[in-house]
Amino acid sequence: MSKTIAINAGSSSLKWQLYLMPEEKVLAKGLIERIGLKDSISTVKFDGRTEKQVLDITDHTQAVKILLDDLMRFNIIASFDEITGVGHRVVAGGEYFKDSALVDEEVIQKVEELSLLAPLHNPANAAGIRAFKELLPDITSVVVFDTSFHTTMPEKAYRYPLPTKYYKENKVRKYGAHGTSHEYVAHEAAKLLGKPLEELKLITCHIGNGASITAVDKGVSVDTSMGFTPLGGVMMGTRTGDIDPAIIPYLMQHTDDFKTPEDISRILNRESGLLGVSEKSSDMRDIHEAMRAGDAKAQLANDIFVDRIQKYIGQYLAVLNGADAIIFTAGIGENSVTIRKLVIEGISWFGCDIDPEKNVYGQYGNISTPEAKVRVLVIPTDEELVIARDVERFKK
């Protein structure tokens, strides 16, 4: 038996889960928030307890030290020697990483180089990797890429209709994201449906603050909504999703807001989406609360959000030539009864329908009506478990 930590490092956060492997038993989980800010918060959950402390955490290395100290302080482990592996989620692996990889300096440098493809994510991912490498240098350390699952896309799906030299020289193409989540829920869907994954056509909808839709045929990704970066695809909490590229030079010429590449990235990635349209919040719960109070901007933000998801589902029905099931996962997909209801109501023409009562109470499983030809499933994602499994694979 061994203990493995799965790590998801954000720019100011570090989410973790400690597993007993290969039993896949969760021993503890936690979240360190506001890294680099005053009043950082470390939360640890184990044995039915929740322990929280507020302190100043300057960087990811200090965050990892606190994580490890907490494991000892709460007697979750008796010695650091019990930890035999760590797996790190990395958003962008580009064309370079087609599978997970053992961490060395070359791999870390490559992750940092690929930050152009995920400027909000890869730098933080690399910081988490370096912190663990410094503090636990001898354990099996593995990077698991969001993009790996999508390397099966055919060229017609991942190429953009730009001059070929930009693909050859600059690697401009669709890479996608959320691959570990899409892969996990596809496998779980096959179990729920009682059929081999290789016989199924699935549309997986990872809908959280970041959101992406994937067409899965016979267990492999054949198309996905996120593109060259996680900015593409459906509308998100603070990201635009797909827009006409000509909008950018137009606004550069006619406003003072779009003067530098940093301005463009900030507005499209951090100030748009639900937040930009509603002018209120990037959180769907806040949007729905405002809608109930009659807020027209919140209503419009919700309507655009639903519309873009419906359009991608329709697109992938064409790509797959039909579907056996649509799967909702991630924060909004798993928890928003309203979004699931609205999305499916607008596309019921092809044979999917949800049972209202199952939708309200269904946090896992089939929420379809008995006569529905296309099943609608709710499956909580577990990206951390996928990461832990990959670490075990590299230990062997």
UniProtKB/Swiss-Prot annotation:
Catalytic activity: acetate + ATP = acetyl phosphate + ADP
Free-text function comment from the UniProt entry: Catalyzes the formation of acetyl phosphate from acetate and ATP. Can also catalyze the reverse reaction.
Ligand binding (substrate): 89
Xref: HAMAP family: Acetate_kinase
UniProt-recorded name of the protein: Acetate kinase
Keywords attached to this entry: ATP-binding, Cytoplasm, Kinase, Magnesium, Metal-binding, Nucleotide-binding, Transferase
Pathway, per record: Metabolic intermediate biosynthesis; acetyl-CoA biosynthesis; acetyl-CoA from acetate: step 1/2
CDD domains reported for this sequence: ASKHA_NBD_AcK_PK (cd24010)
Keyword Kinase assigned: yes
GO cellular component: cytoplasm
Assembly mode: Homodimer.
Any Pfam family the entry gives: Acetate_kinase
UniProt site positions, description: Transition state stabilizer: 178, 239
Keyword Kinase applies: yes
EC numbers, comma separated: 2.7.2.1
Superkingdom: Bacteria
Family: Belongs to the acetokinase family.
